[in-house]
């Protein structure tokens, strides 16, 4: 199989190669060819002028060694900055994550992200800041792909980390800050992408952030929900509220992404510095909270909107189905009201307007994360 990417990816240069996860039989030789080389071979074999003689085949030399092997080990690399609350029996954590497997140089995707987790932790240590919660830093393997005989072959390292290697993180990690391609501005406006439940907290957090114009002229916003592109999705479905710096909408995905042109020549220092500062500040803000700031009403509102859209699109549905829809919408509205009241209580505790003992807080935090997990299920 010879793959030539004509558009959509690797558009930066005719010499660009593009690599993606394999979806095909393991015995089939497969490789990527640049548009430039493909055009040359096509002209040799199929000249535009039919009067020009051409060979029936062309001999080429391929110098490559790349094998897909089953059941090979991969390694997630984890470190910890202990929190002061651990000595009091509070084992809650905040997670910083990025993947270290990459195609070609993988400068933006995702080596800059791994180094940013180091930079954030170094800043905390150098400043003398002592976190309340233990900070876990995880460099993840097998994000690009890693499962044979499956359509769901990417973000494998993250899934294994939270479901198999450290399932006890579920109920303990109050937030995951995941990073992807963080040293490049993918749009004129930056965005933190999160699960529905964290969006309100993040919007209030962003109100106090000054965004440098040289990095993002149109400022900063919050998007929800997360997408399946990156490891924050695998982590979120385990019951850990997750965020990622938004990266999927910009032209970089069509030009440099997964090609040999994702290298240090395409680097924006102002963007990288801002992301260091933004997510360090977010980490410290989360570290000072008593409870995970989860507003479940956002998820139910999205559900209500989805049900209404389905109802509008299926006017020919059976009568018994249509009759049940109003009751369902009413039930969702009542749940939203309860979720609003719960979030108000969470905010009161986090703003220290009401006090709560540690055993009560710890149990409530665990229950909130349990509800979050059920929402993902």
Regions found by a protein language model. Give the residues of each.
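Acidic, Ser/Thr-rich low-complexity intrinsically disordered segments
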Residues: 294-376
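Acidic/histidine-rich catalytic neighborhood of metal-dependent amide-processing enzymes
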Residues: 73-76, 102-197
